[in-house]
Design a protein with these regions (language model features):
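N-terminal leader/pro-regions and domain N-caps
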Residues: 22-66
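Short beta-strand-plus-loop segments that form exposed binding edges in beta-rich domains
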Residues: 63-65, 157-167
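C-terminal segment of classical bacterial N-terminal signal peptides
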Residues: 13-21
Length: 191
């Protein structure tokens, strides 16, 4: 019984000494800038969740057209500034993509994730139309890519859709409530 009391006291002390750092730590996504043939200026809507943990980007023009050579590949490069508490670093946890591929069309979605100055994992998927797709790139299971320690970092995502066939392939959902991309993050103390 004495061991249990000592153990519980130790756990309480450790929790009390560690929790304030995490309770006060606030990772804040500051928004996103974008550019590319699939997301020209003012063609996307950027939204950050109230808790600053999720970023949603809705695209209006991220559509590749298979039978128009100049439109076969569309790309979008994202720059996501994130404010970190001193002594923390972050990792991209997962990314959700939604879109549509027309009949008689094949769409290839490719995305690379990294922090400025580094390389990261690349995901590639092929969809055969007609289909609505909803996929997740689970980065935590294939890569452990962490930012540098500091007050702020710049997360980068380079996404591209290539279409072949007679129709279009989009990164933009027909689902009226949840469209585009959603990024989730995780964070830890610096190592």
């Amino acid at each position: 019984m004495k061991f249990v009391k000592v153990f519980l006291a130790a756990v309480t002390f450790i929790t009390a000494s560690v929790s304030p750092a995490f309770a006060d730590a606030k990772v804040e996504i500051l928004g996103a800038s974008y550019g590319g043939s699939g997301c020209p200026n003012e063609s996307a809507s950027v939204s950050v969740s109230p808790d600053g943990q999720e970023l949603t980007i809705l695209f209006d023009k991220f559509a590749a057209i298979g039978n128009v050579s100049a439109q076969r590949r569309k790309s979008c490069n994202l720059s996501i500034p994130i404010k970190l508490p001193q002594g923390f670093q972050i990792s991209l946890y997962d990314a959700d993509y939604r879109g549509y591929v027309a009949p008689a069309t094949t769409g290839r979605l490719r995305a690379e994730y990294f922090f400025a100055g580094n390389r990261g994992p690349v995901f590639s998927r092929t969809f055969r139309g007609e289909t609505d797709y909803n996929v997740r790139d689970s980065l935590a299971t294939v890569a452990n890519v962490w930012s540098a320690c500091g007050d702020s970092v710049n997360m980068r995502v380079n996404a591209a859709m290539t279409a072949s066939g007679t129709g279009m392939a989009t990164v933009d959902s027909i689902d009226l409530a949840h469209r585009g991309l959603v990024y989730h993050i995780k964070y830890r103390t610096c190592r």
